[in-house]
């Protein structure tokens, strides 16, 4: 199913994005004012997490010309079905309800997905995930963004895989050409402020 809505029509579904649905019943109108009433995400969080999981191979990708290379998701040949159950443009503060998330999980089960990737923290939805696991679906949840202490990790049900980001032990050297044509190698550091301003 490719559900049509604001900023999203049937042409947005393809051989890569094979389905799209959105859920907003019960979400306050104020929370939806800066959001697309469609499977499209206003803050790119869903796009980011989907590309991390299943992004196609893109040669010569870079960030404003820096750190050029090949970008790809963990499973670049995988197809994506979008079930947008949380809305809201504030980073880390989406608006949704247990009902919208459970409806999305139920639809994903019915549609026969192989993997559910949920980048949200809603502990009470772990039983929806249990139903998916009982149907043979691998369920992967985000651990959250609350810090490094074990007690702040969300989505800890024993039947789901909980993933988190970590610091990496490598740098991204980038060649910079100065006005006098001298080239120097520098380490690239990208901050949230820079990303938000771009």
What function would you assign to each model-found segment?
Residues 13-18, 172-174, 180-182, 196-198:
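Generic structural motif recognizing short loop/turn segments at the entrances and edges of beta-strands
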Residues 36, 95-105, 116-121, 195-198:
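Extracellular/luminal Protease-associated
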Residues 46, 98-102, 113, 126:
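Generic preference for well-ordered alpha-helical elements
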